[in-house]
């Protein structure tokens, strides 16, 4: 049978059955190897390596040698195991006519793309197999015949039988142990074309490949990943049984002639990697014989299996049926173990096999446990021509036909049968090489030579054909058919998979085509859209052109209208200008007429004035002549007096030495008692380390009492300012103090020696001054202890900022007081205990001595003569009572809040409503001081006495706090002394001279005791000393006011004396209910020696103590602050141990205090629980928030002022824009000029670039509140488009500056600025409206303008970050001036503590700040309902100690500028009254320049007359009945010459001030807490008034009293002083004023009504101007705002406002804190005005009763008074002095009344009832009935003038 095979690449199938396919191998010999023991072949697989491929592959050339045309024959041997055979399936059949080209060379495609055999081809193969003989399946002769038939196509072929039935190969069941094949596509083996040029058919040999793994490892297997795929050149083959023998014979003959050696090459296509499938190269497979292991080489790219070359062999036919002899055959045994194939396994030597039936019938599964034995040389038999070839060199086997191999090298795969179908070109028959059964253990392969092939084949075929049966052949055919069917199914499956892949590829192509189509369509759509856009662009351009054309037309129309409007406005302006000129002409004429009238009036007045002056000059000439005569007489008298005084001085010096010694003993005892009981002064025990010198200081304390050196708090302030109050080391403090103590002791000894040695007074003064200067420097060095200084300053602030004085003596005693009265012991605690024990012992001894001294003094008073006593009093008072220096702080020291103790103290006050201004619970504050770093000092303080004597006039006067009060002790002592004095007076009623002597003695004792007290009470706190002085002043005034009564008692009337004592006792009993525990020991009070104290010789031993008036730059000032207010309680003064004192009952009444009134009203004791009278929480609110309702009255008044200013501006040619005009301009032109309004909203949310506008309504609100004025420089930080700047510039005319960070908004503002300038020029606005500058910069960066210029800033800081706000506040602190305002939409002060002034950035602002509620629609971004804007004021940066004296004076004198509800202008002691003079009542007031001459200095004061606005002061209609004489009162603490100066001043004043006339003034008081006008704010007081008093509200607004020129000059310009219209005002330069004239209460009320009528009759224009003037003054002053807090409806909220303002004293400068204190006092008193009104009636009735009694006494004693004056002339030659003293007593009598007036004025009793009470007091105290008083007063003063002459 001839076969034509075409090479095609087919896929490998995973079949489990063994199939044989025909191949035509040619064995190519490359090298010859000697025969050896181990002759296996190794398989090397090379992958992707062409170099290795070239090295390993051998050229396919024909070569001469042994083994050409070999045929594989296998012989089973039962003794050896069968090696695994390859599953080789026939995939193609031979064609009818083979050609050399087809057999020699044919290209092979890729293994993946090579299809399997088709179904038709397989059907053609099936009928050939059953035609074989039963003995053998196919013989070699048949194969040769088939090959010859193929080579001869001309021969007609017979009908071919179908392929033999291969079903027997599939019938057997597979072994259960066999595993399925791998799913991975096995490699495909493609045959390479042999290089054979011969036309002869090649050998057809059957190969049995028994191969192991390709890896070098003996245990690894990779055979299941590879397949041998053999393909024939033709797709079909045919078997012809009839011609088998012939064909075989022919083929054998042909083969015998062909002795060429052929190479057999097996090409294996491996599909392990994907790269192999992509490439179309076939893979050669060579089996090598090295190490008997087939190595699979992966280095070759073409994936060829290279079979190592076969050894040279001799051809010999071996009969399969009979075993060959051992010397004639070569057996190659394949040995394998389980799951492995040993290294010796290889493709064994191929032999020609003669198939037998036994082999065909025998089929078994391939066992993997077969073993192979290597070839040996002993098995070769060369003699019998049966040469067994031994592989000696590598050899390639080329397979021209397609061979399909199943994976056989894996131990996982076994089959029942393994047949090798080989179809070669020279043979026509198919040889089947079945595998042996499991029992066969060895297979013998022999190689036969080619010349024996034909003979052996014929013999074998004949023998086999005979033995075979037809049944067996049919069975085999059936088996073959079944196998082919199964194979066909597999091929169909493979074809289906290939078709599926092709379908997938088609789908992919289709998808790609669709994608391209879709892209094409999209491109088309894009082109269409582009065309549409082009059309739209053209349309838009066309519309834009149309729009511009339309806008141009509109612009032209608008310009035309604008021209018309301008023309109409021009005409209107011209019309208004004509009208304005007409009005101006009329106004000018009216003014000229008025000026002409005024000029005539002035000329007339000038003529009258000249005439009057001429008359006055003549009178003055006469007076001067009289004075010169009197002076000459006085000089003669003075010379006589001086001679007598020199004689008396020597006697008195000896007495003074004894007195000093006794006084020192008394003082030491008193000091010890003071320390034990802590009476009304602060003790600060400083622990110095002076133990070594303490004994010396105690021993010398008695003799050196005068060496006391003082330092002022002004000097202390300089020390404190140099020190930073940081903690100092204890050792340094101790060393400093030790050295200071030593220096003081040494210097004190030297000073004492000098004082003893120097006898002259002048030398003493010089030495003392030097020593004082030295000791002051040392004291300053001693105060280097910073903690001590800090403690002193802290105590000073706790006490309300009272000025005090420090002194240091040689005993290391430091005195802290206002007048240096009581020293402080600087001793340790054990030393203090010793002193206390000594004091107790000395106290008992002292009491005994005092009793003895009292008896002695009583005897001396009876025996001494009047002449000597009077002289002694004048001398002793001049010498012993020397004035002491008082160093006052012009401005209290201000220390930064840097220490923990101070912080804790202030925090305690703030948190618990315990403000030091109200002196509540001071004990707790002192405990805090003890705890806070003051371990070295013990601070003790008598808080109860301080609360009794404090000046706050609030709740602190409680009955429970009045224990252990020194003033109470004074009263008890005075009561006892009154009893003693009464006894003395009663015993001496008959002797007038003796009475006068008693008076003089009492004056001596008083002066002496006062001097001693002045030395001892040096450490009293300021407040205590001042209060004691005030009480003494009151007592002296009381005593002086009782001159008439006391004179009557002394001379004639014991009954009157008893009545006065009874009155005193009744009033004292009332005071005793409040004051207890007084009667233990006498207390010393401070006195200020003055002319009043020396003049008490004629007033029955009554000491007159006046409060010192503080000095500033040598000029006296009014006590304006609360520390200077007089307590005003009438307490009698101790004048010694046995002096007589009497007091007037009416003067000892209790002060109208809120707490006292409340006690009397409720008739219950005061409780410590909270009530409405006590202070509420200070932190009820954080700021002063003003509602729209509270702003309304102020805005109404401001509108009137603005309208008036607008009219004035128009009158002066200044035109500003109105609000309506601005709205038209802004919304009509400026706003519409913004092309793209959406630009305003292009910002980042919640950033500093957020844009929000302030609407014009908000700016109008600012203007109405007066926050922005034409003189201001306004700066808007974040101005946006500049709408705020334009409006303020247009309406106010101020200079404006804008800062904007956004460039787009800045550009819009510049365009709007151009529009604004054009429009303003058209309207004719003032040039000040053009001062607009806008900068595009960042505030945090570099500024383009001067930041210090603006004084009003605005920040719309709703979205400003904290960093930006802090940086802006730092700029304020660095550049802005004090008083600069900052308006914000969000508060810059989140919280406030006093320490924030120095530590926080918002400390630059004053506190509390203000917030104002906004109108609705004030902001663009919200409705602004219930929203507020904030107003901050930058505080003074230099808020520390101010040493500029002129600045302080200016502040003190300008404090009353603040219009307030209660004008607290002067204290009670600063306005004493003077007795009337004898001049006529009709004469106008005069000004007489008065020179007060003294022995040492001469001071002159110029007259002052001030004309002030009428709302505050206006002259009353009623003129006083008689002129009264002023009396001077010199402050002893500020003078250096004592009583001598005072005496001279009294004489001059008595002579010069006789014709002065007082001026009646009226103060208009405002009750408004809101600081508004009287008409608007008086409604708040109606609630507290009785219904009967509401109609008299106008009466309560005015108070009539008189002022002198000095006080009027100290009052602020808001007060007006005016005189009668017919005469000019002239006042005396005396510092005291005259009291009002004597009149009844009814007449006084009538006068008040008349004044109110005059006020109401004034024109409306003047009232309006007055109201506006008040508001304007309010703005200039600053301080508290002019409006009230929000919801200030209840009384407690009003108090909260006042308390909160007082709290600012911790944060504000001292000047402003004083203003707040004044405001607080007034508001508290206003709040309690209702209680005062209810209690007034009872007080008024009591005063009436007292006044009636005094009137009766005055009528009875008129004659007796005249007798006393006559007796005084005969008793002493100094009658003038005595008479002056009597007049002074009467002045004091009036002085108390005036004090009551002033205290009532300060306390706020400014209603009509108060006026009535005061006027009644004045009438009751000074005068009798309306008719009798005039005569009596005139007679009295006429008598006095006669005596003076």
From Swiss-Prot:
Protein's UniProt keywords contain Protein biosynthesis: no
Compositional bias (Acidic residues): 268-280, 1643-1656
Residue spans of biased composition, Polar residues class:
1-44, 282-294
Provide GO CC annotations from the record.
chromosome, telomeric region; nucleus
Cite a single Pfam family from the UniProt record.
DOT1
What PROSITE patterns does the annotation carry?
DOT1 (PS51569)
Keywords (alphabetical) are: Chromatin regulator, DNA damage, DNA repair, Methyltransferase, Nucleus, Repeat, S-adenosyl-L-methionine, Transcription, Transcription regulation, Transferase
Catalytic activity, per the record?
L-lysyl(79)-[histone H3] + 3 S-adenosyl-L-methionine = N(6),N(6),N(6)-trimethyl-L-lysyl(79)-[histone H3] + 3 S-adenosyl-L-homocysteine + 3 H(+)
Residues of the region (Required for interaction with nucleosomes and DNA) are: 625-639
Query: What are the recorded GO MF terms, alphabetically?
Result: histone H3K79 methyltransferase activity; histone H3K79 trimethyltransferase activity
How does a null allele present?
Individuals exhibit 4-5 hours delay in development. Development does progress with fewer fruiting bodies and smaller spore heads. No apparent changes in cell cycle regulation.
Q: Which cysteines are joined by disulfide bonds?
A: none
Q: Which InterPro entries match?
A: DOT1_dom, H3-K79_meTrfase, SAM-dependent_MTases_sf
Locate the residues binding S-adenosyl-L-methionine. 1251-1254, 1274-1283, 1300
Lineage top rank: taxon = Eukaryota
| UniProt biased composition (Low complexity) | 52-67, 90-162, 191-226, 239-263, 453-464, 750-763, 862-877, 972-1011, 1020-1067, 1084-1102, 1467-1522, 1541-1556, 1610-1642, 1799-1817, 1835-1845
The record's comment on protein family reads:
Belongs to the class I-like SAM-binding methyltransferase superfamily. DOT1 family.
Protein name, as recorded: Histone-lysine N-methyltransferase, H3 lysine-79 specific
The gene behind this protein is dotA
């Amino acid at each position: 049978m001839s076969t034509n095979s075409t090479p095609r690449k087919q896929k490998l199938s995973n079949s489990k059955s063994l199939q044989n396919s025909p191949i035509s191998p040619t064995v190519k010999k490359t090298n010859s190897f000697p025969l050896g023991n181990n002759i296996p072949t190794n398989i090397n697989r090379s992958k992707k390596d062409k170099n290795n491929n070239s090295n390993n592959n051998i050229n396919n050339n024909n070569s001469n040698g042994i083994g050409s045309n070999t045929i594989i024959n296998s012989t089973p041997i039962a003794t050896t195991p069968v090696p695994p055979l390859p599953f080789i399936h026939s995939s193609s059949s031979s064609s009818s006519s083979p050609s050399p080209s087809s057999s020699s060379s044919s290209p092979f495609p890729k293994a993946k793309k090579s299809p399997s055999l088709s179904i038709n081809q397989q059907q053609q193969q099936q009928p050939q197999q059953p035609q074989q003989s039963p003995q053998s399946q196919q013989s070699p002769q048949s194969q040769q015949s088939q090959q010859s038939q193929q080579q001869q196509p001309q021969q007609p072929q017979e009908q071919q039988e179908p392929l033999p039935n291969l079903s027997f190969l599939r019938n057997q069941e597979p072994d259960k142990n066999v595993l399925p094949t791998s799913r991975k596509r096995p490699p495909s083996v493609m045959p390479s074309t042999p290089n054979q040029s011969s036309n002869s058919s090649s050998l057809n040999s059957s190969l049995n490949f028994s191969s192991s793994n390709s890896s070098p490892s003996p245990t690894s297997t990779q055979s299941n990943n590879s397949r041998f795929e053999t393909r024939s050149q033709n797709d079909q083959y045919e078997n012809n049984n009839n011609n088998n023998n012939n064909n075989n014979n022919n083929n054998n003959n042909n083969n015998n002639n062909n002795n060429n050696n052929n190479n057999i090459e097996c090409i294996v296509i491996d599909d392990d990697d994907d790269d192999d499938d992509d490439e179309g190269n076939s893979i050669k497979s060579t089996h090598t014989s090295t190490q008997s292991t087939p190595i699979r080489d992966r280095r070759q790219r073409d994936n060829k299996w290279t079979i190592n070359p076969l050894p040279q062999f001799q051809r010999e036919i071996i009969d399969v049926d009979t075993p060959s002899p051992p010397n004639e055959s070569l057996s190659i045994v394949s040995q394998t173990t389980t799951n492995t194939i040993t290294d010796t396994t290889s493709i064994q030597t191929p032999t020609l096999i003669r198939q037998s039936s036994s082999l065909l019938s025998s089929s078994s599964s391939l066992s993997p446990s077969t073993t192979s034995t290597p070839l040996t040389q002993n098995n070769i038999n060369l003699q019998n021509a049966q040469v067994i070839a031994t592989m000696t060199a590598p050899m390639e086997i080329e397979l021209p036909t397609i061979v399909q191999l199943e994976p056989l090298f894996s131990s996982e795969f076994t089959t029942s049968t393994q047949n090798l179908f080989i179809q070669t070109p020279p043979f026509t028959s198919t040889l089947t090489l079945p595998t042996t059964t499991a029992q066969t253990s060895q297979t013998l392969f022999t190689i036969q030579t080619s010349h024996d092939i034909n003979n052996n084949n014929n013999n074998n075929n004949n023998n086999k054909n005979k033995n075979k049966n037809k049944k067996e052949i049919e069975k085999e055919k059936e088996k073959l058919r079944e196998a082919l069917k199964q194979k066909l199914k597999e091929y169909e499956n493979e074809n289906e998979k290939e078709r599926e892949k092709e379908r997938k590829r088609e789908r992919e192509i289709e998808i790609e085509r669709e994608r391209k189509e879709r892209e094409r369509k999209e491109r088309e759509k894009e082109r269409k859209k582009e065309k549409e856009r082009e059309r739209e662009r053209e349309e838009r351009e066309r519309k834009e052109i149309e729009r511009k054309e339309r806008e141009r037309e509109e612009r032209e129309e608008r310009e035309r209208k604008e021209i018309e409007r301008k023309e109409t406005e021009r005409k209107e302006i011209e019309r208004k200008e004509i009208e304005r000129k007409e009005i101006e002409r009329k106004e000018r004429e009216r003014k000229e007429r008025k000026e002409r009238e005024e000029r005539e009036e002035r000329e007339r007045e000038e003529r009258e004035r000249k005439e009057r002056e001429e008359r006055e000059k003549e009178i003055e000439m006469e007076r001067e002549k009289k004075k010169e005569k009197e002076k000459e007489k006085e000089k003669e008298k003075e010379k006589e007096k001086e001679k007598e005084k020199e004689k008396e001085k020597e006697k008195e010096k000896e007495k003074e030495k004894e007195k000093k010694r006794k006084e020192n003993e008394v003082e030491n005892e008193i000091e010890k008692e003071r320390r034990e009981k802590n009476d009304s002064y602060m003790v600060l025990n400083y622990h110095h380390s002076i133990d070594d010198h303490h004994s010396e200081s105690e021993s010398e304390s008695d003799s050196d009492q005068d060496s006391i050196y003082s330092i002022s708090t002004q000097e202390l302030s300089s020390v404190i300012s140099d020190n930073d109050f940081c903690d100092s080391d204890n050792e340094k403090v101790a060393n400093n103090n030790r050295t200071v103590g030593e220096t003081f002791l040494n210097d004190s000894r030297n000073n004492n020696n000098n004082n003893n040695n120097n006898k002259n007074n002048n030398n003493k003064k010089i030495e003392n001054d030097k020593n004082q200067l030295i000791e002051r420097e040392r004291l300053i060095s001693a105060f280097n202890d910073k903690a001590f200084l800090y403690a002193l300053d802290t105590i000073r602030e706790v006490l309300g900022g009272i000025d005090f004085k420090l002194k240091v003596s040689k005993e290391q005693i430091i005195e802290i007081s206002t007048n240096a009265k009581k020293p402080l012991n600087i001793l340790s605690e054990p030393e203090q205990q010793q002193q206390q024990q000594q004091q107790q012992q000395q106290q008992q001894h002292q009491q005994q001595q005092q009793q003895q001294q009292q008896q002695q003094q009583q005897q001396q008073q009876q025996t001494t003569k009047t002449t000597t006593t009077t002289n002694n009093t004048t001398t002793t008072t001049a010498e012993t009572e020397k004035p002491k220096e008082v160093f006052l702080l012009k401005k209290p020291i201000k220390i930064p809040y840097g220490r923990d103790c101070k912080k804790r103290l202030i925090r305690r006050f703030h948190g618990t409503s315990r403000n030091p201004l109200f002196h509540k619970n001071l004990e707790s504050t002192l405990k805090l001081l003890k705890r806070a770093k003051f371990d070295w000092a013990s601070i003790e303080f008598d808080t109860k006495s301080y609360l009794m004597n404090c000046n706050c006039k609030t709740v602190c006067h409680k009955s429970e706090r009045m224990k252990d009060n020194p003033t109470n002790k004074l009263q008890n002592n005075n009561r006892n002394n009154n009893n003693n004095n009464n006894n003395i007076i009663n015993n001496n009623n008959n002797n007038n001279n003796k009475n006068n002597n008693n008076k003089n003695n009492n004056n001596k004792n008083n002066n002496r005791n006062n001097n001693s007290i002045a030395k001892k009470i040096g450490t009293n706190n300021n407040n205590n000393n001042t209060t004691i002085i005030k009480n003494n002043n009151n007592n002296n005034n009381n005593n002086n006011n009782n001159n008439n009564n006391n004179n009557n008692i002394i001379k004639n009337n014991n009954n009157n004396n008893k009545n006065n004592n009874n009155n005193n006792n009744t009033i004292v009993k009332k005071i005793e209910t409040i004051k207890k525990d007084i009667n233990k020991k006498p207390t010393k009070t401070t006195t200020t020696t003055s002319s009043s104290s020396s003049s008490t010789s004629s007033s029955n031993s009554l000491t007159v103590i006046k409060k010192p008036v503080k000095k500033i730059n040598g000029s006296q000032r009014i006590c304006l602050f609360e520390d200077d207010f007089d307590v005003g309680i009438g307490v009698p003064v101790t004048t010694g141990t046995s002096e007589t004192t009497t007091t007037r009952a009416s003067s000892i009444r209790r002060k109208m205090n809120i707490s006292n009134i409340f006690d009397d009203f409720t008739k219950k004791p005061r409780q410590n629980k909270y009530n409405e009278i006590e202070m509420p929480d200070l932190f009820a609110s954080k700021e002063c928030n003003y509602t729209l309702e509270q702003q309304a009255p102020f805005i109404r008044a401001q509108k009137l002022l603005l309208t008036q200013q607008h009219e004035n501006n128009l009158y002066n040619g200044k035109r500003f824009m109105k609000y309506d005009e601005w709205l038209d301009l802004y919304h009509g032109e400026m706003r519409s000029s913004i092309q793209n309004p959406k630009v305003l909203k292009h910002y980042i949310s919640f950033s500093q670039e957020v844009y929000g506008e302030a609407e014009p309504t908000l700016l109008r609100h600012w203007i109405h509140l007066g926050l922005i004025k034409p003189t201001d420089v306004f700066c808007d930080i974040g101005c946006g488009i500049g709408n705020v700047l334009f409006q303020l510039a247009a309406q106010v005319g101020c200079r404006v500056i804008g800062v904007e960070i956004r460039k787009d908004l800045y550009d819009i503002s510049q365009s709007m600025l151009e529009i604004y300038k054009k429009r303003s020029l058209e309207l004719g606005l003032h040039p000040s409206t053009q001062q607009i500058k806008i900068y595009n910069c960042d505030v945090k960066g570099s500024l383009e303008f001067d930041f210090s210029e603006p004084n009003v800033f605005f920040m719309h800081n709703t979205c400003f970050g904290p960093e930006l706000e802090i940086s802006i506040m730092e700029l304020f602190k660095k550049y802005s001036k004090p008083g600069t305002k900052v308006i914000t939409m969000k508060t810059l002060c989140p919280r406030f503590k006093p320490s924030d002034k120095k530590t926080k950035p918002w400390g630059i602002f004053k506190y509390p700040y203000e917030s104002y509620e906004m109108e609705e629609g004030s902001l663009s971004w919200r409705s602004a309902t219930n929203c507020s804007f904030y107003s901050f004021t930058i505080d003074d940066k230099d808020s520390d100690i101010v040493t500029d004296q002129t600045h302080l004076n200016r502040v003190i004198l300008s404090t009353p500028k603040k219009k307030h509800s209660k004008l607290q202008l002067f204290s009670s002691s600063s306005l004493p009254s003077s007795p009337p003079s004898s001049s006529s009542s009709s004469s106008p007031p005069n000004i007489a320049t008065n020179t007060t001459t003294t022995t040492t200095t001469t001071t002159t004061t110029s007259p002052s007359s001030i004309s002030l606005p009428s709302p505050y002061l206006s002259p009353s209609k009623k003129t006083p009945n008689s002129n009264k004489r002023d009396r001077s009162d010199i402050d002893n603490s500020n003078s250096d010459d004592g009583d001598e100066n005072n005496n001279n001043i009294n004489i001059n004043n008595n002579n010069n001030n006789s014709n002065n006339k007082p001026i009646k003034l009226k103060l208009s008081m405002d009750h408004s807490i809101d600081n508004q006008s009287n008409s608007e704010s008086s409604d708040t007081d109606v609630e507290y008034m009785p219904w009967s008093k509401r109609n008299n509200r106008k009466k309560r607004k005015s108070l009539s009293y008189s002022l002198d020129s000095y006080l009027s000059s100290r009052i602020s310009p808001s007060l007006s002083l005016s005189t009668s219209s017919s005469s000019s005002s002239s006042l005396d330069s005396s510092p005291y004023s005259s009291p009002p004239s004597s009149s009844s209460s009814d007449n006084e009320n009538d006068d008040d009504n008349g004044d109110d009528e005059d006020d109401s009759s004034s024109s409306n224009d003047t009232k309006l101007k007055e109201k506006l003037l008040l508001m304007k003054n309010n703005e200039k002053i600053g301080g508290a705002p002019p409006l009230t807090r929000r919801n200030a409806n209840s009384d407690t909220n009003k108090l909260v406002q006042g308390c909160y303002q007082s709290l600012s004293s911790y944060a504000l400068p001292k000047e402003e804190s004083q203003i707040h204190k004044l405001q607080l006092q007034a508001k508290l008193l206003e709040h309690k005005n209702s209680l005062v009104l209810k209690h007034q009636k009872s007080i008024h009735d009591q005063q009436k009763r007292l006044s009636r009694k005094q009137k009766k006494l005055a009528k009875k004693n008129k004659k007796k008074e005249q007798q006393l004056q006559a007796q005084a002339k005969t008793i002493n030659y100094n009658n003038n002095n005595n008479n002056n003293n009597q007049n002074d007593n009467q002045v004091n009598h009036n002085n108390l009344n005036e004090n009551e007036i002033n205290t009532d004025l300060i306390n706020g009793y400014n209603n009509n009832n108060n006026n009535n009470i005061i006027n009644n007091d004045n009438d009751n105290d000074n005068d009798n009935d309306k008719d009798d008083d005039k005569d009596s007063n005139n007679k009295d003063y006429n008598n006095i003038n006669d005596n003076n002459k």
